[in-house]
């Protein structure tokens, strides 16, 4: 069985400064994200052992561990692509139009997304996703690494609100971190995800 691996980044750790420090990015990538990758592979190995023994309690435990660690791996893999030293500004094209139609304006969307991030209790993510059943954009809070999200939603933009993503630089002032995040959003990546979600998902989950 092929193992999950830690992806390389498209930019140097210090490339997002002063908005997100190189120290944070290096620790975040090589320690935290790497731990999720290891957790996924460990959970899969333990699942194989549990299945071979028909140990259902161990199967259920490691399925939960797999969901958590795989969620962490997926979320962080999106996170690194969502960021760019050449980011910021605003989206364009179909994504910009859809944001305006859904939220009223980009500024209103940004305020709603930021409120979701700043208002998150405990650890998790704020997410802009595309609902493939309703064919609409949604913002929501993702709890921990995998909870509070219905199936069929494609993540487009995420901000990591776990303390390891900001505390070394912003301490407990989450609002400053979220404000800085907008300066490094890679809208080209978000637009690419939006185009794929709106054109390639038909029939994958819903007819």
UniProtKB/Swiss-Prot annotation:
Gene3D superfamilies: Fe,Mn superoxide dismutase (SOD) domain, Iron/manganese superoxide dismutase, C-terminal domain. Its cofactor is Mn(2+). Belongs to the iron/manganese superoxide dismutase family. It comes from Mycobacterium leprae (strain TN). It is an enzyme of class 1 (oxidoreductase). Mn(2+) binds at residues 28, 76, 160, 164. One of its GO terms (molecular function) is metal ion binding. It holds the Pfam family Sod_Fe_N. Binds 1 Mn(2+) ion per subunit. It comes from the Bacteria. Signal peptide: none annotated. Its EC number is 1.15.1.1. This is Superoxide dismutase [Mn]. Destroys superoxide anion radicals which are normally produced within the cells and which are toxic to biological systems. Keywords: Manganese, Metal-binding, Oxidoreductase. It catalyses: 2 superoxide + 2 H(+) = H2O2 + O2.
């Amino acid at each position: 069985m092929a193992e999950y691996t830690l992806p390389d980044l498209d930019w140097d750790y210090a490339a997002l400064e002063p908005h997100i420090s190189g120290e944070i990015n290096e620790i975040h990538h090589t320690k935290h994200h790497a731990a999720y990758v290891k957790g996924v592979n460990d959970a899969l190995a333990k699942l194989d052992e549990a299945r071979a023994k028909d140990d259902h309690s161990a199967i259920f435990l490691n399925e939960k561990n797999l969901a958590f660690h795989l969620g962490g791996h997926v979320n962080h893999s999106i996170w690194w692509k969502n960021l760019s030293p050449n980011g910021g500004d605003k989206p364009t094209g179909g994504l910009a139009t859809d944001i305006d139609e859904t939220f009223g304006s980009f500024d209103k969307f940004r305020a709603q997304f930021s409120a979701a991030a700043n208002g998150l209790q405990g650890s998790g993510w704020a997410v802009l996703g595309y609902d493939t059943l309703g064919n609409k954009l949604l913002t929501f809070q993702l709890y921990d690494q995998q909870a509070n999200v219905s199936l069929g939603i494609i993540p487009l933009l995420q901000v990591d609100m776990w303390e390891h993503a900001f505390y070394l630089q912003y301490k407990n002032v989450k609002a400053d971190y979220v404000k800085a995040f907008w300066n490094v959003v890679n809208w080209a990546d978000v637009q690419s995800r939006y185009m794929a979600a709106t054109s390639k998902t038909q029939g994958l989950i819903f007819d």
